[in-house]
Curated annotation (Swiss-Prot):
Pfam families: RuvC (PF02075). It catalyses: Endonucleolytic cleavage at a junction such as a reciprocal single-stranded crossover between two homologous DNA duplexes (Holliday junction). Disulfide bonds: none annotated. The RuvA-RuvB-RuvC complex processes Holliday junction (HJ) DNA during genetic recombination and DNA repair. Endonuclease that resolves HJ intermediates. Cleaves cruciform DNA by making single-stranded nicks across the HJ at symmetrical positions within the homologous arms, yielding a 5'-phosphate and a 3'-hydroxyl group; requires a central core of homology in the junction. The consensus cleavage sequence is 5'-(A/T)TT(C/G)-3'. Cleavage occurs on the 3'-side of the TT dinucleotide at the point of strand exchange. Its EC number is 3.1.21.10. This is Crossover junction endodeoxyribonuclease RuvC. Its main location: cytoplasm. The active site is at residues 8, 67, 139.
């Protein structure tokens, strides 16, 4: 049984989603958003770090997965997003969690079946697959999709006789 924390990083809104996996079953445990309140980037990064530490304490995940950033609207946005990812990754490593990274295309493909899926399609599939009464908000749905992608990727590698740590995990130590 694994508890996976998925994170969709952002400097203003960071989505998180927690699922429990056993065999082929995925159970929704919780999700939401860390909304930063300060205009100062260092304060926002601390809010992300502190928020994720609290989520880690609450849910006690054994695995951590985060979306890998590959583009942004401009250089300043890319730098801020990278720093938000860094705050999230540090929160995971401080807790001793292995860190796995996935591209947006990998995540969408694992959950929707196509790497070009729209946000609404991701929300719908997350709702259906986790049997939720309503679609989660976009950032939380993306984070749940990250966790689900990690689970599917891990299961596929194990089924093929491989080790889940090969090519899947980015370890930060």
């Amino acid at each position: 049984m694994a508890i996976i924390l998925g994170v969709d990083p952002g400097s203003r809104i960071t989505g998180y989603g927690v699922i429990q996996c056993q065999g082929r079953h995925q159970l929704y445990l919780g999700s939401g958003c860390i909304r930063t309140s300060s205009d100062e980037l260092p304060d926002r990064l601390k809010q992300i770090f502190d928020g994720l530490q609290e989520i880690i304490r609450q849910y006690q995940p054994s695995q951590f997965a985060i979306e890998r950033v590959f583009m942004a609207k401009n250089a300043d946005s890319a730098l801020k997003l990278g720093q938000a990812r860094g705050a999230a990754i540090v929160a995971a490593t401080v807790a001793g969690l292995p860190v796995a990274e996935y591209s947006a295309t990998q995540i969408k493909n694992a959950v929707v079946g196509t790497g070009r899926a729209q946000k609404a399609q991701v929300q719908h599939m997350v709702q259906q697959m986790l049997k939720l009464p309503a679609a989660p908000q976009a950032d939380a749905a993306d984070a749940l999709a990250v966790a689900m992608c990690h689970y599917h990727t891990h299961q596929s590698l194990v089924a093929l006789g491989g080790r889940a740590s090969v090519r899947t995990y980015g370890r930060y130590r």
